[in-house]
């Protein structure tokens, strides 16, 4: 039986969701080269379910005919920074395609760059990944080498989720590269809820101080919006604690 994850005191389910589980829309799989096979757009969603025995409980959702259908994704933001990677850059853990696309070479470069420019234009990814076996049905987030590239990217630029093209689903796809999950033909990506909670909290602790450090207006709101995109709400008590202990 699927159970709701135990949330931290400051981490509450987003009020926009009526389900017991946080649900996040993934964009159509054919968008931006993130997929290796197509599915119907209405079948693609991110849902959180977890079985205490240690297995993801996907079966609880497969036959739920009353579950909400996921709306088609919005198109990519016009003029966004587009990061194009392929097998070569992935295999060498080469981050230069990202650095060239957005015009920085190290995290320290943001000390002189204007974060608002990246927040306005946003960042997206196109993954040109050629499979050894054309019949391999796995999604890109299920390939270890692809995920490892994103793990390194996230380690170098931990505030990156804030700058992604949220409306086109880039944040949900990015999370799928870093958070344990399984694939469901009906539900799409099914996250481990505890891992998703930790991912969200980690990003809150990174993003909120980063926004304040760069003088970006309304850092609490922007941080909360990021968490809400993944199905969680952040209480002011947590921001107060961060501010008090800086």
UniProtKB/Swiss-Prot annotation:
Knockout mutant characteristics: Impaired chloroplastic NAD(P)H dehydrogenase (NDH) activity, probably due to a reduced stability of the NDH complex.
Keyword list, A-Z: Chaperone, Chloroplast, Plastid, Transit peptide
Transit peptide as recorded in UniProt: 1-59
Function summary: Required for both formation and activity of the chloroplast NAD(P)H dehydrogenase (NDH) complex of the photosynthetic electron transport chain. May function in assembly or stabilization of the NDH complex. Required for the accumulation of NDH subcomplex A, which is a core part of NDH. May be involved in post-translational steps during the biogenesis of subcomplex A.
Assigned GO CC terms: chloroplast; chloroplast stroma; chloroplast thylakoid membrane; cytosol
Protein's UniProt name: Protein CHLORORESPIRATORY REDUCTION 6, chloroplastic
InterPro entries: CRR6
GO biological process: NAD(P)H dehydrogenase complex assembly
Pfam families: Crr6
Organism classification: Eukaryota, Viridiplantae, Streptophyta, Embryophyta, Tracheophyta
Superkingdom in the source lineage: Eukaryota
Localization in the cell: Plastid, Chloroplast stroma
This protein's encoding gene: CRR6
